[in-house]
Amino acid sequence: ILMGKRMWEVIDLDERVNFPLYFPVDGDVMSSPDRRPLYNVLVSAIKEGKITEVYDSSYFTTKKTLKDIEASLFKIDTSDVGREQMNEDIDAYRKGTKKISEEYIRKTEIQAYDVDAYKVVGYWYFDKRQGELKYRMLGICPVVPDVYTMGDDSAQKEYIELFWVYFPSSRDVLHAAKAFNNRNSAMSFTFDHLLNARRFSGVVYLEENVYGDR
């Protein structure tokens, strides 16, 4: 390697070229039983223990547990009617002898269609033997709404980095998952190929430099 630099990019899922990372969302899966959104592939593999290299930042220093991730995936709230029901006999609810009716409990959960973008970090380097500029992906992160800012019309959604997956450790999982090929639907890609071959459009928002990644 003659030279190299680490760069961070954001992949906007509203761009058509990036649709294979987003679709099919829930509701479209039956028409494409062999394909799932990238978000579902990642979250399912984490829950099943197939992906274990999951971190809280793109520097891959502090791991996130499944419990940490699940705390950001959903929230449970009680409706006003449910609170009134609880206030009628609050001691019984505190002791657990009574429970709020299920119809008055609201659960909000992050779904594949909530993913707004992906952030990726990779390493560009010049291979002097082959005389080529090459790219090696290091990590990927779904950007989703903070679940605690969802479901309230008066609140402005805030977006968070859900988790960072160390890409080299997830390649087996991504190689087994199919993505749509815009040019030839009869021949699907794998997510591993799509990401590693940079078949997406990204905008650089950070780069490695002497000032400390700005």
Tell what function each PLM region has.
Residues 113-115, 135-137, 160-162:
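Extracytoplasmic
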Residues 118, 123, 138-141, 165:
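Generic beta-strand hydrophobic packing signal
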Residues 132, 137-157:
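Extended serine/threonine-enriched, polar tracts that run as long, contiguous segments within proteins
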